[in-house]
From Swiss-Prot:
This is Oxysterols receptor LXR-alpha. GO terms for biological process: apoptotic cell clearance; cell differentiation; cellular response to lipopolysaccharide; cellular response to starvation; cholesterol homeostasis; digestive tract development; hormone-mediated signaling pathway; insulin receptor signaling pathway. Keywords: Activator, Cytoplasm, DNA-binding, Metal-binding, Nucleus, Phosphoprotein, Receptor, Transcription, Transcription regulation, Ubl conjugation, Zinc, Zinc-finger. Its main location: nucleus. The modification Phosphoserine is found at S191. It is found in: Nucleus; Cytoplasm. The gene is Nr1h3.
Length: 445
């Protein structure tokens, strides 16, 4: 979920945040479960002092997954394109194109073993980034494949493994649900009529299933784009004097820039929600400005690690309660964040359930300054019904799961009030927020 940031400019009017809603819809659903739309422009400023503007603009389509890195001219193996159609019959003595072990079949377009197949799939789903300690030129065999993951992944890509062939766990789950529904529909159509009343089975309509698939694809797109922004975030200070003024300012800048990335995700995800762009520009602004912090907290809870009691942003940055305090946040705000994240973690929600909860939170008709409340309520009802049907299928033996999930949205309203107090406290500490966050949270200097 991300939106784009323009380069720093000298001045930004108080209404600059409203420029973000001149757009045409981006349809992640049309791209399929494994494709998305990315913007390849510099989005993070070098400092938080410059003015930022957010924009909902149409984008050029590219691949969902990050581009494979540019490789030096290979000498040992060149990628071979395989013709479309069924895989050729295996003779039993074929070798893996990556490590030379015994191949089991064609996986992700390449003849490979089960080990390299699983390694490639895990690496793509996790967006893993490995580091070679030998200069990136390790010869790959059954021994070295365990020693150097970077060179192994490079060899997988060079052999021709295609990232777009990898389905995420959530897409696999949705695919199974779709197959189960088709089987149920077929069994219902051919089963003989009986006198007993038919059993009412929870079902997702084709429209609901398609919508959920679109939301999951949009989430993956936005998360990958935000991950690419991590190198532009002000680094966490490692200073001889951690209590120095410079170190405190750097920690605060680090957290505010992470918040900017999160706001980008929210806006970019919202504009891909079916029905959002059909609302008036004023209602789009009102919904996003008031739901932003609640959606940020939902996303934060997804990254909670109960073992270390820490929260990880952009896959590389992990923080505990003490780190939040060092960045200038109050314990009255820190503790509720971690408690909410812990309680959400106990629900063990998947990507589809999180995406639907976020959509329900965004389409809240009782937000201030919403004009067409009836239409917003209708849109929210669509997502509530989809979540109810999905949860009934995904948690058939837990009838309280659906109400527990909706109650989390009530808890978010309380946390939103605590956040307002935190923003006020930052102003008292003379800590200035970047223009984008000031506009989203209505902070007037």
């Amino acid at each position: 979920m991300s939106l784009w940031l323009e380069a720093a400019v000298p001045d930004v009017s108080p209404d600059s945040a409203t420029e973000l809603w001149k757009t045409e819809p981006q349809d992640a659903g049309d791209q399929g479960g494994n494709t998305c739309i990315l913007r390849e422009e510099a989005r993070m400023p070098q400092s938080t002092g410059g003015a930022l503007r957010i924009g909902l603009e149409s984008s050029e389509p590219t691949a969902l997954l990050p581009r494979a890195e540019t490789l030096p001219e290979p000498t040992e193996l060149r990628p071979q394109k395989r013709k479309k159609g069924p895989a050729p019959k295996m003779l039993g003595n074929e070798l893996c194109s990556v490590c030379g072990d015994k191949a089991s079949a064609f996986h992700y377009n390449v003849l490979s073993c089960e080990g390299c197949k699983g390694f490639f799939r895990r690496s793509v789903i996790k967006g893993a980034r490995y580091i070679c300690h030998s200069g990136g030129h390790c010869p790959m065999d059954t021994y070295m494949r365990r020693k150097c993951q970077e060179c192994r992944l490079r060899k997988c890509r060079h052999a021709g493994m295609r990232e777009e062939c990898v389905l995420s766990e959530e897409q696999i789950r949705l695919k199974k649900l779709k197959r189960q529904e088709e089987e149920q529909a077929q069994a219902t159509s051919v089963s003989p009529r009986v006198s007993s009343p038919p059993q009412v089975l929870p079902q997702l309509s084709p429209e609901q299933l398609g919508m959920i698939e679109k939301l999951v694809a949009a989430q993956q797109q936005c998360n990958r784009r935000s991950f690419s922004d991590r190198l532009r975030v002000t680094p966490w200070p490692i200073a001889p004097d951690p209590q120095s003024r410079e170190a405190r300012q750097q920690r605060f800048a680090h957290f505010t820039e992470l918040a900017i990335v999160s706001v980008q995700e929210i806006v970019d995800f919202a504009k891909q929600l079916p029905g959002f762009l059909q609302l008036s520009r004023e209602d789009q602004i009102a919904l996003l400005k008031t739901s932003a912090i609640e959606v940020m907290l939902l996303e934060t809870s997804r990254r909670y690690n109960p073992g270390s009691e820490s929260i990880t942003f952009l896959k590389d940055f992990s923080y505990n309660r003490e780190d939040f305090a060092k960045a200038g946040l109050q314990v009255e705000f820190i503790n509720p964040i971690f408690e909410f994240s812990r309680s959400m973690n106990e629900l063990q929600l998947n990507d589809a359930e999180f995406a639907l909860l976020i959509a329900i939170s965004i389409f809240s008709a009782d937000r201030p300054n919403v004009q067409d409340q009836l239409q917003v309520e209708r849109l929210q009802h669509t997502y509530v019904e989809a979540l109810h049907a999905y949860v009934s299928i995904n948690h058939p033996h837990d009838r309280l799961m659906f109400p527990r999930m909706l109650m989390k949205l009530v808890s978010l309203r309380t946390l939103s009030s605590v956040h307002s107090e935190q923003v006020f406290a930052l102003r008292l500490q003379d800590k200035k927020l970047p223009p984008l966050l000031s506009e989203i949270w209505d902070v007037h200097e």
